[in-house]
Amino acid sequence: MDKNYNENLNYIEAWSVAVNALSGKKRENLLEDGFVSSAKGYKVCYITEIKNFTFRGLGFGEYNLSSSSKCEKKIKKCSITVNLNCDCGFYAFYDQSKAFNLAENYRGLVPIEVELYGKIIMHKDGMRGEEQDVIRVFLSRICSKGYCNREGIYLSKKVSLYNKKKKYLVRCEKHKSNENFMISEISKDKIDIVRY
């Protein structure tokens, strides 16, 4: 089977697992009033830029260490960024283990810890917020290449043959690409990096 097809299928599968767990389709899971103003959560993403720390979520677009959401669908009822009529915003799980389970099942995904601000809608398993700060990035200690179990010491650039999108993956010496960053040398003053 085509490698690009499998990569795209894994991406769609991971995205649907996350969306099904958190999406606005489960409106009956809202808490009493459904809104809070700040909360900590966990999610998964791809790292797309190292120097400026840019991430790509499983749903819409890219974001930085500190970002505000906007309606990607341009729905008239969605004049306020986060509301019950739209699915836009930054999603996060309450439970750290849900993000780590997704990352373990789909190599290349990176669990991160975030703080959501602004208008936040609370659901049974997670939340959706207006603004987001990435406060911690969790990087695997092992190489993300297939069944390799060597120590991952680099973040290596990989460009998808399917959609030409780039991401940085944890790689060992043997599987590193031409564009690499040593994990130990990445600036820790911008973000807390935790190895697991």
Language model features: what each stretch is:
Residues 162-179:
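Cysteine-rich micro-motifs
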Residues 130-136:
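Long, amphipathic alpha-helical segments that form or neighbor coiled-coils/leucine zippers used
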Residues 1-88, 100, 104-125, 145:
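ADP-ribose/NAD+-binding catalytic cleft of ART/PARP-like enzymes
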Residues 138-146, 167-170:
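Cys/His-enriched microdomains
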Residues 145-151, 175:
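Short Cys/His-rich metal-coordination motifs, predominantly Zn2+-binding knuckles/fingers
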Residues 187, 194-196:
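Long, low-complexity intrinsically disordered regions enriched in Ser/Thr/Pro/Gly
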Residues 151-161, 180-186:
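Short Cys/His-rich "knuckle" micro-motifs
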